[in-house]
Amino acid sequence: KKFLLIENQNKSDLIEIHNRPIYLNYLTKELSNRNYILYFHNDPLSMNGSASINDRIFLLKNCYRIVFNSNWSKKRFLEGMSSDAINSEKLIVIHQSAAKNKVDIKKKQKIITFVGKLNRSKGYDLFGKAVLKILKKYSEWKVFVAGDEPRDKIYFNHKRLIKLGFIKHAGIIDLYKKTSIAVVCSRWEEPFGRTSLEASANGCAVIISNRGGLPETLTNGVILKKLNVKEIYERIEKL
């Protein structure tokens, strides 16, 4: 209501909505003479206001543009839609970006890194089992883990597996600068995957699962053919 009061005074030419497609149902009734741009940062089929085909037809009709963070997200939006929707110029993809920092590859350390929630959805259970085997075989390597997830309670212990807990973004970038191998082995369908993008931008060799928009984050990464401990271990060892 407060936004409507402000907007009735401002009379904006364009209104951006991020990740809340359900808001269009209300706004188009009260502010019908506006141009709307809707940004999807997550799976459209998992959100109120875009889960059904009728929801998405409504959005396509009432939005000036609909922006997706990956081709995968756009494909999800178009599931079950007509050819008119598929060919609509209203639908565009804008990938996220990351600063490509100057990194001296010679100064990279023998470090394998995992960044994210330490749960099954992110594949941390698979990663942990794989890197314990690596640490056992290669005594000069270390593993750094940044993140937490008290609900899943997945623990791996080794003197060269360093758990950093939650750290701020600047700390993550500093970690990537000295990391040689970064692993993003998610089970769930990542709408995009900023973690792998930033790892690559900071000179890491990156291993990813073939889930959601993750393959769109890299040009020269390693994509796991199978998402299991053996495959992760073998890809790390090869690198």
Segments (PLM) and residue ranges:
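Nucleotide-activated donor-binding/catalytic signature segment of Leloir-type glycosyltransferases, i.e.
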Residues: 152-173
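Acidic donor-binding loop of glycosyltransferase active sites
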Residues: 177-191, 204
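Short beta-strand->alpha-helix junction loop in the catalytic core
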Residues: 43-44, 72-73, 91-103, 150
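A short, active-site helix/loop in glycosyltransferases that binds the activated sugar's phosphate group
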Residues: 26, 49, 56, 61-88
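Short His-centered aromatic/hydrophobic patch
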Residues: 17-22, 40
